[in-house]
């Protein structure tokens, strides 16, 4: 399945039905009063989040969505039928923007959550509404109002608590496959991972935490280089980042600086997100070299540092203990903040 995480669509709500001009035509009442009914309401366009979709692929092929118009009014004061709303399903995690103003209209993060993106037009008034002492036989009615129309930009941001970041071939896919049941494509060359991979890592209690392997981050990713521009947005929802650095690379420190610079350049608070630095592939590094790199990175950054190997699982238990500790502390801080607001 092709992973599509952004799309632009046009939505058009239904127009309201027209009011009509009609008069009572009853036996023994040759000149009855006005009886034209109102038009029905046009259908609105509503997005609803569902767990049954994982990408925005469908919106690459169907980009125009139009709700039905309301029906015109009828004689004898009958109101025209209102149109049904048009329901459009989107994946959980879809952020919705007005494509022209860039205004965020809503963020659909949980199944069943809805967002009205275009309101149906009101029905027009029939001539019975214009009866007055000075006009006993009004000959005019109002047309229905047009429904809203707008261009929408949809962006799918993965719902993961922990994001794995690093240059291509840093070992992110291997790590997520070892920690979870995910089965990403893995090979010894850059850009093996072309789409974000999700994996659920479970604690001893059975509770699951979603990890995301974010692919394609290279120098210039925030400007669209490599695969990074499209996928940096997926880090936005994460609460904790694990930055993997390949110790077998030519210059691990330069690699670390590259990713940190991209997070800062992208903005939106990514560079301030809590991080764990994981020096990876220690199974292929001499002990004296490992000690050297540990000292170098500890002098470079204050973030927690661990040495790991997905190949022989060294350091992975310690990594998970640190992840759970961080997440628990973030939960406690969020609860404390919420309590202060309520008080």
Swiss-Prot record:
This is GTPase Obg. InterPro entries: G_OBG, GTP-bd, GTP-bd_Obg/CgtA, GTP1-OBG_CS, GTP1_OBG_dom, GTP1_OBG_dom_sf, OBG_GTPase, P-loop_NTPase. It comes from Synechococcus elongatus (strain ATCC 33912 / PCC 7942 / FACHB-805). Its main location: cytoplasm. Mg(2+) binds at residues 173, 193. One of its GO terms (cellular component) is cytoplasm. GO terms for biological process: ribosome biogenesis. Keywords: Cytoplasm, GTP-binding, Hydrolase, Magnesium, Metal-binding, Nucleotide-binding. It holds the Pfam family MMR_HSR1.
